[in-house]
Amino acid sequence: MEIQSRGYQDQSDLSTIGSLIRQVYQIDAYWNSWSFALFDIWSQRNLGDQEVFGMTEWQHNIRLWEDRNRNLLGAAVFRDRDLVKLITFPDHKYLLVPMLDWVEARGHQKALPNQKIKIETSEHNPFFEKLLLSQGYEKDPGHYIYREKDLTGGQNELVILPTGFTIQHIDSSDDLEKFHHGTKLVFNFPDNPDIYQILRLAPSFVPELDLILLSPEGQIASFGSIWFDQRLSLAEFEPVGTVPEFRKRGLGSALIAEGCNRLRRLGCRKVSVMSWSESVEANRLYQRTGFLPILKKNYWRRR
């Protein structure tokens, strides 16, 4: 098979990569480490940075591998300065070799020592992990835990809130301001409302699943965005957080229960979430709310 690689050309390449991720999921759900939701978020935020701030450097951090008919077979992406995602079909896993070569060459262009490049894998892709070992990479001790919850065959969950607290979706600029205040308090992430409007154009964005939980005084107490692919009947929570002063009151559990109930009404069969291995409270929350650990997403660097 004749295969060639090329750089990013236009916005349609992002749609094609998103389609590749979804196609591979239907073949082998756990082969690639990048979920459709996290890719949608990443791509829309980059388009937002481009439109709002004129930032285009991210375009040079994408490489695509295609057959002679320009069907996409694989892609390599620097998600940020040093974190790399590689996407392939299982039948085209051999492309991971030239992809890795490109990653290291691009890292040199970015003035990154090989030891600084961090490559993410799914532990359900042993070929990729063995390849990295053979090339002198070693696994970091920390990892993400990927969890899933089955939404079929069950009744709606109880949404238990303290008196006066309410859950709603973001429906106004005031709601969005409260949400962004929450993400800054929890994750130290000061979001931009103009970029967020572009983020909302993602194919997996559903307005009714962009949730905030408010105190009786109207303060942001907890929040959670859920991304839904109707064709896959799969959703993902990202992000989820509770403002420090409102923790230990069951608000995270209530918001997740409400989100799962809304997903059931949309016909969603499964929802996922990820948490860092050392995030004790987050892992307890997801375990308590019915998310079962499925796999680890590992990170590799050169020795």
Please report, for each region that a protein language model flagged, where it lies by residue:
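Conserved active-site tyrosine of GNAT-family acetyltransferases
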Residues: 128-132, 286, 291
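Conserved donor-binding loop and adjoining core beta-sheet/short helix segment
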Residues: 6-15, 22-110, 224-234, 240-243
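Conserved acetyl-CoA-binding loop-helix of GNAT-fold acetyltransferases
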Residues: 93-108, 242-244, 248-265, 270, ...
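Conserved N-terminal entry element of GNAT/NAT acetyltransferase domains
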Residues: 1-28, 138-139, 150-173
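A structural microfeature
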Residues: 74, 141-143, 221-222, 295
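Conserved hydrophobic beta-strand within the GNAT/NAT acetyltransferase core sheet
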Residues: 117-120, 237, 271-275
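Flexible, substrate/cofactor-facing loop regions flanked by secondary structure
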Residues: 152-235
